[in-house]
């Protein structure tokens, strides 16, 4: 089966629906993008676990933007999830461009 180099956005209100999409499409895509609504859902752990089980890439689109120290702390708190990609807005200053993820 051909696997496309694309991400599927999982931005539905229901994580049950998001998980269903992962189970149906994981063989065909490169990864899944999880945004605010899906990530801050009270069942996001299930969604993240399903993406990890699928062996697809995880893109957390949380648009981290604040002062450098706060963004760095946010990234540290996400390290247990180990996302493959993360949205980081660096308009907070030169220090943000030096953060190692």
Predicted regions: what they are:
Residues 1-95:
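Conserved N-terminal beta1-alpha1 strand-loop-helix module at the mouth
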Residues 99-101:
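Conserved small/polar residues in nucleotide/adenosyl-binding loops
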């Amino acid at each position: 089966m051909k696997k496309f180099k694309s991400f599927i956005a999982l931005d539905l209100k229901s994580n049950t629906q998001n998980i269903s999409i992962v189970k149906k499409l994981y063989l065909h895509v490169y990864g899944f993008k999880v945004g605010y609504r899906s990530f801050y859902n009270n069942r996001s752990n299930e969604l993240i676990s399903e993406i990890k089980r699928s062996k697809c890439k995880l893109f957390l689109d949380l648009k981290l933007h604040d002062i450098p120290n706060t963004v760095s702390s946010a990234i540290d708190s996400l390290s247990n999830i180990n996302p493959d990609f993360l949205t980081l807005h660096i308009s907070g200053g030169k220090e943000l461009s030096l953060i190692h993820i």
